Each structure stands twice: as structure tokens, then as C-alpha cells.
């Protein structure tokens, strides 16, 4: 107060005012502070001071020919004085106004293309909706977020090559554009930016924004996708938040979201197959997300999520060194431990073999809706500070930490037997057994934990076993905080190994991830996910299995056909027919298979009975282990649409309908593709059609006139002879039989005779 009075007193004297406004600053330290180095020390003051001058801007000398000396109001636009230390002229801000209004017009066609990210942002904001502002305490935690909506996912190096190729195509320097995305983008941008007059440097900057993911470590409460982050300053403050719905989606957010869904589906499916790792790799390599190969996305996309990281580990990519337990990401911040096996008894006297962490360690735990700091010693929780969105989220974090602590009172709180299994019906490991048990019901765990009196610490309160907050008492070692715990900020990636059962370990052998950690949450992907692998056909239910199986046969018909005739057993064992078996009633699978295999064998033996449509229709039924029986079927049942539907052995049905004229196959009304019938069917002139009712006499005999086509044969009278053109352009002499004999003997002798006649 005294100082202020003194200052006021000084300011009232005219001499003080004069000293402050008129005298020069000659103190060396001050001069040094403001003149050393190139860095501007007070940019906003400098700007204000410059703009108060008459000619604060410098411009190229050519400006004097392009801009008049005075504008319509008679104000001077540029000074005849040169800028000190350069050959530029001094210009008034009014010259900029004149230029904007009267300067030369250039084509604006490239602006929306170059400044695409800005134009799109304006559109999103225009169509976005801002809701009410709420005042409340914001629990923000720092997370690594994507700050640049609408980008591709190229690495900095890949983007640099693309930019050089697009903007400076004639510059020297080795540029290798390898990835598909690089080539597509380069081609697209070169076309878009033909004759572009915007400065190359600007184009390069803008391209970088479009191609590379930029991340920052920012305090966030709420949505973390890039379309929310771009308005972070509008949606959350220290004590307020504003509701906001983005006015558009961007591909990078959609890719992230769809990648997580695809990875979860693939890990869940692989976990139940005979060889999880091989299956997972097969699925990753054959899946596309929004038209891009999933493996390409995995190589470029930095999303950290359990399933995504398992897929990356399988591909030999580096991942974050943090580990996952109970849906929380744990990062050790200090301490160390060694691991040793111990056998512990549960409250139900069941023995659990557990890897105990021996030593003092501190961790941060970050989940979707709660975060915590955990300090633990050997089998003892020392302290847990939790913060979360709501009571439920806080409870989830507490359960995970209590199980992770491996404390005796937690193990003794188990009631009943632990026999949880994973999707493949294998028992879970002991730690996950405990976790599942208490996630189902944590009442006994919380009651047995013990409570303690607490000191009053700013920003922290206690929590009782029934999850009510308290300022006097709390569960032992556990406090709830208003402040969130920041996510682990480092982007460091480590080399990991993965075993056959998809357990991911770091180089010290610690398990970082396993399929048990993959969330069961189902979502709808924003981009189309195309799983080409037959293992994923089941994901959309029985109908999709039916359609996909037949589509696969049609797409691969050329190879299937050869295998069908030469190596049927190998064909029947193809994994693509596995999903189909779940549609066939279990009791009759074997009989169907035996029946179809016998039918096929007859087709192979009896030339001329080959029937493409029928083979395609019945092939999936032959994949089950066959039972020998004398049963014949006129229709086969498949379980789709909640009931049995019939597929007719001969003829069409809703489940399998082939239109001979359009050559289209429809399965349950869905198009399954075009069938290219074999030339050896119908009337196209190969052995099979020759055989029925004709006797082959030998090589061509000119006396019987020119060779007829197979269609013309039908006009022959019984006993009449003719030359006929068969399949491979060979001509043989045939005679129409005098009586209709068995097709079978005809066919067999015919093949032998054709061979003899041709040779």
C-alpha cells in the first residue's frame, strides 16, 4: 500500500512524467536485453509500435510501378525513402488495402485445393452446433491427441518425398515413392495443382498439414478425436465446459475408430482358432479398412489400443512399453521388482499359482473414464489416488488396483470357485480369474479391505466400502482426488515379442498385453471394413457366411475346378468351408457330406455329367467328415434366418438361385456373382456333347463331307455317319446309334476312342 502511495505521489509531479516520457533509455543492461540476439523480446509491443508509424511495411521495388503514389483520398501509399539495409521500399498499410481492392486478379481455382484443411474446418464449424455452457470443476488429464483433422497418415519421411515430388519435381535428390498411399496422393496432387501460382513454400506447408499426423500432449476432459481438439479452446476452460457437436467427420478420426473395431474383431476371432498367431496375421493381411490395406494402416497409424497393439506386435512393429491390465494402461514411473512364482490360497481354499512382483514400484494407471496413481510394495498396496468421471468409474479403477496389488486380503475375499474361461474355452490366468471375479461383485473385497482415519488434504477425500465419499474415513490407502493423472507422454516405442497365444512381452519377459485385455465393447465402424478372410465371415451372422462361401467359390472357380477333378480331398479341407459347417444341422452333416462326395465321384467318372452349378451348390456340404450311408437327398438344409432353409440338389431355391440366361447367382436374394459356365457344358462343342447316343468310328473321313458343328449333329438320322468337330479343334468320324443305349458305356468307350482317333 505504501509503495502505491509513493508511486502516485511521484506521478503527480510533472518532472517524473517528463523523465518517463522524454528521456532516453541509456542503461546498458536494458539496451542489452532488448537488442541482443535475433529473437524479438516483446512481439506485441513491437507490432503496435511499428503499426503506429507511417510506413511500417517493406516491399519489393516493383511495387512503385504497380501501386500509385496516392490513393483516391489523396493519402500517400509508399515513401520514396529506401528501407535501411535492403533495397526495398517503405510502404503504408493503406497500400495493402489498395492492392486488395484494385490489384491484379489471379485465378482462385487453386485456393480451396491448397488451403483444403482450412476450408474444411470452416465448413465443420459452420455446420457444428454449440450447446449451453456449464460451470463445473473440470477434471482434465493430459493426453496425446491429434490436433490436425483431415490428414493422411504418412510418416514425416514419406510426406517429405511426396511434397518434393509434387512441389519441386525438378529438384535433384533421391526420392523413392513406395507405398500405395504415396503414389495415389502424388498423382492426385499433381493433377490438382497444375499451373498453381501460390508460392511453392506455402503449398509445401499446406501439403504437410494434409499428409502428416500432428500430435500434442494437451489437457483434455471429453472427446479426444481431432474434430473436438480443433475447438478445445471453445469447449473447455478451467471451470466451464461448452457442449459441442462437430459439423462433419474427418477421415483420420474414422480410420482410427474403424481400425480399433477391426483389430478387436480380429483378435477375438483369432483367439479361438487352432493357431491364434497365424490366424491373426492371415486376417490382418487380408482385411481392408475404407479401401486401404489394414497392414498399411497399422504401419502408419500411432493409435494405442490393446487390440491394435497386439496386431502391431504380431507384424513385428514396435509398440509402447506400457502394459495393460483390466482395461487400464499401466506405466511404471519409479521403482523395480523381480518376479517369482508363489502358490496362494483363496478364501475358498483353491490354490492359485501367481507371479508375485517383489519390490517397491509406482505406476500411473490411465483408463477411458478414470485415472490413478498407484504405489505398491510386495503384495501390499501402499497408496492409491484415483480420479474419475463418476462413482462407477472410480470403483472400476479401485478393483483393478486392489487385484494388481496381489494383497492377501484380496485373495482371501474370493468366495466360490474361480473358473472363468476365455472365448476359446481355456481357463484364464490367475490374475485375470481374480479380476473377473471381483468385477462381477466387489462387495466382499471392499468390506474386507479395512478402513482408516484420514488427514484433511486439499483436493483429496476418502471413499468408504460402499463408495460414498467421506472426509473422516477411507478404505485403507485409498483416496479420491479432484485432479486427473496425466497419460504417459512419451512416444517411445520398444521391440516386443509375441507368442502363439497372442501374449505380448517386452524384452525382459514382462507380459504387456494378452487377448484377455481386449475390450468386449461392440461398435459400428465409420468406414467399411472388408474382411476377405473366411475366418471373419461369421461376424455378420449366418446369412453372410452363406453368401461369402458361394462368392468365394465363384471368385476362385478356375482353381477350384482343377482341384475338384484332380485333388478333391485337398479342396474339401480348405479353411474357407469351415464357417459353412456351422450352418449345417450337426446330426446330418456327415451324411450330407458322404452323399455329395459320392455324387461328385460319379460326375468325375462319367464324362458328360459335369455340372458347374451343381458342383458349386453342393461343394461346401462335402467339407464335413463324411459318413458312409446309402441315403439319397433331394434337398439339403441350412440354418439361416432362424430356421432351416432348403437348398435343392437339382433346381433353384431362395437359398441358391441360378439364372441361366443372366448367368447371375443369387443367395437369399443377394447377388453372389456371375457364373462362367464351362465350355464343356451345354452346346459349346467338346467331347461330352459328342458322346451321348453316338459311336465314334475313327479319324476324319472326307467322303462324309465337311465337319459339322455339334449343334448340327442332332439332324442326323439313326445310323447316319458324319465328320464332327470336337473340343480342341480335332475332327472325328461318328455314327448316330441305331438304338438309345446307356449313356454310361457310351461315355466310357467314347473317351478311349476319341483319344485313339486323335492320336
From Swiss-Prot:
Gene3D superfamilies noted in UniProt: Polymerase Basic Protein 2, C-terminal domain
Keywords in alphabetical order: Cap snatching, Eukaryotic host gene expression shutoff by virus, Eukaryotic host transcription shutoff by virus, Host gene expression shutoff by virus, Host mitochondrion, Host nucleus, Host-virus interaction, Inhibition of host innate immune response by virus, Inhibition of host MAVS by virus, Inhibition of host RLR pathway by virus, Inhibition of host RNA polymerase II by virus, mRNA capping, mRNA processing, Viral immunoevasion, Viral transcription, Virion
Cell compartments where the protein resides: Virion; Host nucleus; Host mitochondrion
One term of GO molecular function: RNA-directed RNA polymerase activity
Gene Ontology biological process terms, A to Z: 7-methylguanosine mRNA capping; cap snatching; DNA-templated transcription; symbiont-mediated suppression of host cytoplasmic pattern recognition receptor signaling pathway via inhibition of MAVS activity; symbiont-mediated suppression of host gene expression; symbiont-mediated suppression of host mRNA transcription via inhibition of RNA polymerase II activity; viral RNA genome replication
Disulphide-bonded residues: none
Main subcellular location: virion
Entries under SUPFAM superfamilies matching the protein: PB2 C-terminal domain-like
InterPro entries found in the cross-reference section: Flu_PB2_2nd, Flu_PB2_6th, Flu_PB2_C, Flu_PB2_CAP-bd, Flu_PB2_middle, Flu_PB2_N, INV_PB2, PB2_helical
Gene Ontology CC annotation, any one: host cell mitochondrion
Site residues by UniProt (Mammalian adaptation): 627
Motif range (Nuclear localization signal): 736-739
Task of the protein: Plays an essential role in transcription initiation and cap-stealing mechanism, in which cellular capped pre-mRNAs are used to generate primers for viral transcription. Recognizes and binds the 7-methylguanosine-containing cap of the target pre-RNA which is subsequently cleaved after 10-13 nucleotides by the viral protein PA. Plays a role in the initiation of the viral genome replication and modulates the activity of the ribonucleoprotein (RNP) complex.
Family: Belongs to the influenza viruses PB2 family.
Oligomer status and interactors: Influenza RNA polymerase is composed of three subunits: PB1, PB2 and PA. Interacts (via N-terminus) with PB1 (via C-terminus). Interacts with nucleoprotein NP (via N-terminus). Interacts (via N-terminus) with host MAVS (via N-terminus); this interaction inhibits host innate immune response.
Protein name: Polymerase basic protein 2
Provenance organism: Influenza A virus (strain A/Northern Territory/60/1968 H3N2) (Influenza A virus (strain NT60))
Lineage of origin: Viruses, Riboviria, Orthornavirae, Negarnaviricota, Polyploviricotina
Gene name, Swiss-Prot/TrEMBL: PB2
